[in-house]
């Protein structure tokens, strides 16, 4: 499922509020971005471990490639509880966006890691649909693509601000198309959604990375606020990664 990319959007005009030397700015920026990526990687690790743990507890055996569910797995995936798993990440995003301003950095980080655990639980059903080998393969493909795109967004001198409105419109479009396809179950529409989803989140990865860089350079904050914003940045890039991964898995993953 595609989510609104971040609870915050930010822009930048001229540098204000930062009086340090260029060396201090560069060191601060590196520390800020390192915090963003570290939090994001920990979040991905939590999601992966939760998804794997729930899958192991839910599958008793495989009949060919078809999973035989345990009673726990039947409760988790075949009862109304499956809707809780599906919708819980959206609830976390809503709460996170409403309370972010009032949270401390440590509370925001805890909330993000809790969200990552819930997201892992929500995605655990993917291991029932796709083979484990293809999930791992697509994960590494996504990691390579994400790393390259994020690096480009960080280093490019070209402003990517013009992409923002286009990408947001595309994101809204694939969300609406996905909702429509719940009723039509069209494989052709799903293929188109997946292709567009990969392209949109590839663009958002570069766009959001550049925006995070600009937010630090022009925002004039440090200390607690910088730590809090690094968590917000981790959430933004985490969602870019997760959505790109899921769309790629839909395109090239091996189904059971």
What are the functions of these language-model segments?
Residues 2-256:
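A hydrophobic alpha-helical transmembrane-helix feature that marks the membrane cores
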